[in-house]
Amino acid sequence: MADSSREENVYLAKLAEQAERYEEMIEFMEKVAKTADVEELTVEERNLLSVAYKNVIGARRASWRIISSIEQKEESRGNEDHVNTIKEYRSKIEADLSKICDGILSLLESNLIPSASTAESKVFHLKMKGDYHRYLAEFKTGTERKEAAENTLLAYKSAQDIALAELAPTHPIRLGLALNFSVFYYEILNSPDRACNLAKQAFDEAISELDTLGEESYKDSTLIMQLLRDNLTLWTSDNADDVGDDIKEASKPESGEGQQ
């Protein structure tokens, strides 16, 4: 497999996606990414890489939330033996999460961000960098959490600077960045006002230019706008403290070319 061409690895990644073998999908797309030192990934390639990692990390994030919820219930009941067992099990999931995040962050730093030449590609990969530092911040504690949060903020701000200057307010990648950046403010930094302001500004700016939206990205853009509005409704409601699990974030790559 080491000598497989870039095209063959892309095709194998598509097969792995159809078979829902996402760990293997990552392996194939990492090979592609490591050959993209000079030439950046195509829209299709970066979306395949994103989908692969999103599925692998998503399953572990869901597992971590379930186990953490059980841990809280057992703590409230005073079941110390169970709590200790759960903590050990949770640490295994956290080790998995760390390994996955470290893998994509290393790839982004060494290959993907340096080779990105278009504004769209730069924002896509910087957003991705912010996303995976944010996933680390979700479960890390102490100085590690602080460092992960700082890295998230830096990546999202770098992406935002380019997006605001180079991408239209209706561009799905710009909207997806605003969505995930606002979730970061709300969930990680506990700044609901900043989260709401960022989400509202992105939504309002996109609404004002909706008539300029091309047919190819209309579906992607309006979907993310709906998610922004859903979060705003959630965050400004009286019972926002009780509905953390319902917060929406960009779960699919926003290609700008209608590829979900």
Curated annotation (Swiss-Prot):
CC annotations in GO: cytoplasm
Renumbered residue ranges of the record's region Disordered: 238-260
Similarity-based family: Belongs to the 14-3-3 family.
GO biological process: protein localization; signal transduction
SMART domains: 14_3_3 (SM00101)
Basic and acidic residues bias (residue ranges): 245-260
One matching Pfam family: 14-3-3
Residue intervals passing through the bilayer: none
Gene name linked to the record: TFT4
Subunit-structure text: Homodimer.
Name of this chain's protein: 14-3-3 protein 4
